[in-house]
Design a protein with these regions (language model features):
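Gly/Ser-rich phosphate-binding catalytic loop and adjacent alpha/beta segment
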Residues: 1-163
Length: 163
């Protein structure tokens, strides 16, 4: 990854700092918390979904939902190509991404995981992520901004891995 690409990723990530004093963990329901705590997590799960799409060469689902709970209680989770839950093998990486204390640490985690998992970054697969939501808290989660940032991030990841 060249310096310009690293700067773009770091700049994008610096818009979504993780909440202080909160440690999130990926489980059956994905990441669950009050909507006010999930902005950085949703952004980082977008990265996770993009990497999962590259690894599986399939469409990945990303959902914001907790329809059976009070409105402020939200979750963000990934659906694998089969429609099932995210592979348990990827959950520790999901936890690490969500809890990375800085954009620099986030970048390091991404680079290490791509290498460890042998994720093909040769540019012959276009990332495909479907986003669904069922909650009124989408505005609180900054989806308009996040969607723009995620699209920029996906494009950045594509450029990085094609070079």
């Amino acid at each position: 990854m060249n310096e310009e690409q690293q700067c773009l990723l770091l700049s994008s990530a610096s818009r979504f700092w993780p909440p202080k004093g909160v440690k999130l963990s990926y489980g059956t329901a994905g990441f669950r918390a009050d909507a006010s705590l999930l902005q950085s997590t949703v952004y980082r799960v977008g990265i996770l979904a993009a990497l999962r799409s590259l690894k599986t060469r399939s469409v990945i689902g990303l959902m914001i939902t907790a329809s059976h709970n009070k409105v402020s209680d939200n979750g963000v989770k990934i659906a694998d190509p089969s429609g099932g839950m995210l592979s348990q093998h990827w959950e520790p990486f999901a936890d690490a991404l969500a809890n990375a204390p800085s954009p620099q640490h986030l970048l390091l985690l991404i680079n290490e995981f791509v290498e460890k998992e042998g994720i093909s970054v040769d540019g012959d697969w276009q990332v495909e992520v479907l986003l669904g939501e069922t909650r009124d808290q989408v505005e609180m989660l900054c989806f308009k901004q996040l969607n723009r940032a995620s699209l920029q991030l996906l494009e950045l990841l594509r450029q990085i891995w094609e070079s």
